[in-house]
Amino acid sequence: MYGFSVYLNEAIDRDHIDRMVAAGFTGIFTSIHIPEDDSTAYLDRMQDLGTIAKAYDLSLVVDISGTSLHKIGGSFEDIRPVIDLGVTGLRIDYGIGFDMVARLSREIHIALNASTLTEQDLEQLHYYQADLNQITAWHNYYPRPETGLDMDTFKRHNRWLKSTGLRTMAFVPGDDKMRGPIHAGLPTVEAHRSMHPLAGTLDLITNGNIDDIYIGDPTISREVLFQFKEYIEKNRICLRMESARDAVAERVEWILGDHTNRQDAAALVIRSQESRRQLRSNDPIKAVNTDARQFGAITVDNEGYGRYQGEVQICKVDLPQDEKVNVVGQVVQTDKSLIPYIGPGQTFRLLQK
């Protein structure tokens, strides 16, 4: 599942939710115990958010503390008013005993703090007869720089969580409007704090033993949202590129669009398996812009490479100048972190920035 965050310190932006749903996101996270927020508007805004969530059949998970449910008209003794709002899950961190967690799990989905969950905690849940099919493991996000989790420790712990049958979830930061008061991104893993949100997502999926990913910050840019949409709906990674200064325009236009990395993936470059077949002209490709190739360089083999003429490649590492290879463009800096996730058989699209 892919989800996003909507915070109750501002009026609910229906247009933003519409865009996220259109891109394939199916879950909403919100919180009712953020110290900086004015909680007097929580109930009205939660009603608005719940109505939208129900209309789109979205999951809606609310982060709560031991004393916050009354802010949205509910209580631990009677959770039904919260469910009626459209809330499908409660994210519980501290201050609530496992006996209560177990009872709640028989009525509503419960997300527990993945980072601190232990074997003894699971034994307590079993003891109190929790519905473990209703319980998942959600990591926190970390607003302060330098406090996010270490990736190695994180993935080891997630491996254990998944071995118990629990589904895992983590946050990646946005790249547009950052949540205050620190405005430094809301990642789970520290290494993702300044990373492209989709690259952080792919890292969690590929390396982090994570099932569900949510955007922690309130928004992502339109360009990044499009990249998420392409990946969620078509399993395609989109890379934005800038043309080399002296690149021949028709050659740049020719390489834009969809490609597939060869199944026998190369170590140093991404090789488009379609590119030589798609060469539109029998005219030889002359040597031009045969510069040194930096990480993220987009290249076309010229006539000097014989039958390889027309092959489009993206450099995964810095490579030296080669008279037989034309540099036609460069993946933009922010998208370079997506390159390592274009593995064997992965489709990708080149877009002009």
Where are these regions (language model features)?
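Hydrophobic faces of well-ordered beta-strands that scaffold small-molecule active sites
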Residues: 2-6, 28-30, 58-64, 88-92, ...
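Short, acidic/polar
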Residues: 9-22, 71-81, 121-125, 196-203
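C-terminal functional modules
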Residues: 245-353
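Catalytic alpha/beta core domains of metabolic enzymes, predominantly
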Residues: 115-247, 252-254
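Glycine-rich, proline-tolerant flexible connector loops at the mouths of alpha/beta enzymes
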Residues: 26-49
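Active-site mouth loops of central-metabolism enzymes
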Residues: 1-15, 62-73, 116, 183-195
